[in-house]
Amino acid sequence: MPTSHLPTSMSCIAIREPGGPEVLVPQQQPMPSPAEGEILVKVMAAGVNRPDVLQRKGLYPPPKGTSEIPGLEIAGEVVAIGRNVTRWKQGEKVMALVGGGGYAEYCLAFEGHALPLPATLSMIEAAAIPETFFTVWYNVFERGKLAKGETFLVHGGSSGIGTTAIQLAKALSARVFTTAGTPEKCAACRKLGADLAINYRTEDFVALTKEATEGRGVDVILDMVGGDYIGRNYEAAAVEGRIVQIAFQAASRANVDMMRLMLKRLTHTGSTLRARSVADKSAIARAVETHALPLIAAGKVRPVIDSTFPLHQASAAHARMEDGDHIGKIVLTL
C-alpha cells in the first residue's frame, strides 16, 4: 500500500549519545515505509522498558537491521501495509512487539508480531502488553513450564514484568510468591494476587518460601536480578525446580554451588526476546493471543499502569523508571 497519503517525516526520540535520561532528545526523521510482511502503525502509545534504558546507556545496541530509535512495544492504528500482508487492514487498531522504533509517531511492525486491541483496554494499557506479556508467557509457561497447582516465585514483583507474571500465574492456578523492595510495593503485589509478598530489604526470601512450602521449595523462579540471587534461587528451588533468567540487574556473574543444582536436578535456563527471529516472535505472539488475551477479555488480567508521559518527555519517563519507585508500567503517549 503506498504511503503517499502520509507525511514525509515524523517526530521521534533519538539517543544523542550514550548517557543518562537527558540524552533522549526529540528529533525529526524520515517516515518509514513498510516492506514485505510489515505494517506501518500510527503510534498512540508506547511502553517504556528496562532494555530501553540499557540501550540509552550504550549497553544494549539494537540488532542489525532494526531501528536505532528506542521502544519495543506500541499500540496504535494501521495506516499502511506492505506486500503479502493478509491479516491487517488500514484503520485497524493493534498492539505490537517491535525490534525498535517505538518512541516515534509512526513505527514499523511485522505482521505476525501484532495483536488485536482488546475491546476492554485503552491504547495506553494496550501499549503496556507486548514486551511484558511476550516475555512472561514464553519464559514462565514455555521455558519454565509452570503448571496448575505449582508454586511460582517472581523477583521484582512490582515491575512491569512482575505485575504481569503475578496475574498470569495466578489466573492459571499457580501459587504465587514475589519479592519487592518496600511495604507499599509488597501490598500492591498482594492486591494483584500474590499469595506471599516478601520485602527483600528486610526479609529472607529463601527462608520464607521454604516455610510457605513446608520445606519443599519453589517449582518455578523467574529472575531479573542475577548476582548472588542465583545461588539463593538454587536454595529456594524445589527438587526438579526450573529457574528462568531474563535479566541481571545486580550482576551477570555469580559464584554458585553447582552441587546444589545437581542434587536437586535443577534446570537453569534463560532467554532474550529482542534478537529472536521473526518466526520465533510470531509463534510467541500467537501463544499470547491464544492463552493470555482471553484472560484480559475476561477481566482476570490487566496491565498495571504506573504513569504516563508525552513522547517529548521520554527523558522524564526514563528518570521515573530509574528512580525505582514505579509500580507497573510507564507509558509514553502521543
Predicted regions span which residues?
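N-terminal Rossmann-fold NAD(P) dinucleotide-binding loop
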Residues: 162-163
